[in-house]
Amino acid sequence: MSEANHKNIVVVGAGIIGTSVATMLSKVSPNWHIDMFERLEGAGIESSNENNNAGTGHAALCELNYTVEQDDGSIDASKAQEINEQFELSRQFWGNLVKNGDISNPEEFIQPLPHISFVMGPTNVNFLRKRYETLRTLPMFDTIEYTEDMETMRKWMPLMMENREPGHQMAASKIDEGTDVNYGALTRKLAHYLEQKSNVSLKYNHDVVDLTQREDGKWEVVVENRETKEKVTKIADKVFIGAGGHSIPLLQKSGVKQREHLGGFPISGQFLRCTNPDIIKQHAAKVYSKEPQGKPPMTVPHLDTRYINGKQTLLFGPYANIGPKFLKFGSNLDLFESIKPYNITTMLASAVKNVPLIKYSIDQMIKTKEGCMNYLRTFIPDAKDEDWELYTAGKRVQVIKDSEQHGKGFVVFGTEVVNSDDNSMIALLGESPGASTSLSVVLEVLEKNFADDKEAWEPVVKEMVPTYGRSLINDEKLMRETRRETSKNLHLNR
């Protein structure tokens, strides 16, 4: 690649998304220089950290909100197929990084683990049965098993069935090809790889404090060393903001028009963590249920086996806790400083339209450990207070925006990618399934922000993600070959 193709790129945030974007960009050309800035002292400390999320490899195997019951009673599985395909793209990327020796020991960040859906009550059982009948016809999900038999459920989830009173209608489905992903460990491996690259400069304890676009389209990015308070200005052709909850404030500082009519509502995640090894070893699955009627998708309860630092552990949640910080290590002024003249009507409209979400958040805020334990006992009837501790995990900032389809103050559940008009800046906002589908974000960055350089990056992408540009949904043979290859590269056949 000629010197004329030289680019300076700034990546803000060294979480799973930022390190994934930087890793792919670093491979495209030695003439693309990447300055990467993380405000904390290391990579993957905020939402990507293994203690700050449930570690689900989101592939729509057990998450019921990706399969929607239609008015005629049929099940729409298109979103589930989309999420599954996106996770397969991420698996290809990770697997080829391992295969090429860029990162090592995949068992330190990904483990095979059954994914189970579990519901109670006739309405939910009927839904799960119909979901099973739909998914079993789709190649991506055709290994799914279903049961309404308590003895079978006892084999799948012995801890959850122990001393459970008979008489309640229950059902479960299971897919054995699920995974537990330690996104913190993966992020640190990607960061270590980037630290060795000659065309990457990764600096910790450096905070991006201002962004200004010049008349020539380039960006002036002001960065402050949080230890010395020294400020420097970097000139960038492209800027990617993957700073978790801090992305909205940075987008606002950039001055792009996409910042208007957009805001965020911060919510902390809380989990109950089991402290009794004898209990932990009785459960080996991720079990997702259905959100309570009238509650938002974030309220879906799940019981998660986790593998952290080589040890098996067990989490239940999430519970929510509201507060003004946009980051776990943020400021109590974050929410208030994000309310501007150009988004205040959006925020007010959201407050009016989303009373159930606000009520849920307040209910969660005042919930004690006793209340959390009572909810856990719907999953584990014999759960004892002394075996569990309640802790605060990561922050999520629910994106609030105006849209033609939903009107003013619409709350976005999921990941939102925002591009400037000239595609020189891209920001990732929102929440799950972001980490699992990180490679899809990488591809969107390349396709939108680097469209003129496709000749340079497309061969690299096809090497790292061989199915790029092809459909795993419509090509069963390709899907099965890809799964076999990624399972081998990631050492999942164990």
From Swiss-Prot:
GO terms for biological process: tricarboxylic acid cycle. PANTHER family: L-2-HYDROXYGLUTARATE DEHYDROGENASE, MITOCHONDRIAL (PTHR43104:SF2). This is Probable malate:quinone oxidoreductase 3. Signal peptide: none annotated. Transmembrane segments: none annotated. It comes from the Bacteria. Gene3D superfamilies: FAD/NAD(P)-binding domain. GO terms for molecular function: 2-hydroxyglutarate dehydrogenase activity; L-malate dehydrogenase (quinone) activity. It comes from Staphylococcus epidermidis (strain ATCC 35984 / DSM 28319 / BCRC 17069 / CCUG 31568 / BM 3577 / RP62A). Belongs to the MQO family. Its EC number is 1.1.5.4. Pathway: Carbohydrate metabolism; tricarboxylic acid cycle; oxaloacetate from (S)-malate (quinone route): step 1/1. It is an enzyme of class 1 (oxidoreductase). Its cofactor is FAD. Pfam families: Mqo. It catalyses: (S)-malate + a quinone = a quinol + oxaloacetate. Keywords: FAD, Flavoprotein, Oxidoreductase, Tricarboxylic acid cycle. The gene is mqo3.
